[in-house]
Amino acid sequence: MNIDNEANHIKWLLNELFVDLPSAISMGREAIQIPDESIHSIIKAAGRLRVCNHSIIISLFKLHEIKQVYGRFLGTLPREVTECFFCDVKEIERRNICKFRSKHVAHIIDNDTRKPISLEKAESLLSSITGHDNSQTLAFYDWICPEDWIEKPCVVTSIQNLRDYCWKMPGGDLKRP
C-alpha cells in the first residue's frame, strides 16, 4: 500500500472512532442514571449498558487493529504524534479488551473451550475492564472520553490528534477509500 494512502485510511478509521466512542460513552452515562429502582427500569438500563459497552469494546479493539495493520507506517510518524495512541493501545491490551471482544462480544464460541463463554466468565471479563460498580464504570468512561474532554488527555483526544495529523499529510485529504 502506498504510504500516502495509509495516512488517508488511518484518518478515516479514526474519524469513525472519534464519532462512535463519545456517542457510546454518552449513552452509557445516561443509562447509569436509572430513574427509579423498578425492575423495568433496571432491565432497560442493563440492556442499554450492554449495547453501549459492547460498542465501546468493539471500537477500542479497532484501535488495537489500527496499530496491528498500520504499525509500520505509524512508526514513521513523529513520536509526539503517536505516543498517546500507542499508550492507549497498550492500556487496551492490559485491560483484556481484545480478549473480551474475541471471546464474547464478537463471537459466540470461545476458541479455547470450543463452547460459548459462560455468563460468569463474561461478567468477570467485563468487570475487569469497566469495573465492579457504576463509579468504576464512570472512571473507565472518563479514561476514554471525560464529559468535557476537549484538550484533556484521554483516548478520544489521542484519536483526534492522530487523525488531524494524518489529515494534513500528503494523501490524508483524499476521499474515503
List PLM regions with ranges.
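Amphipathic alpha-helical interface segments
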Residues: 1-96, 111, 119-177
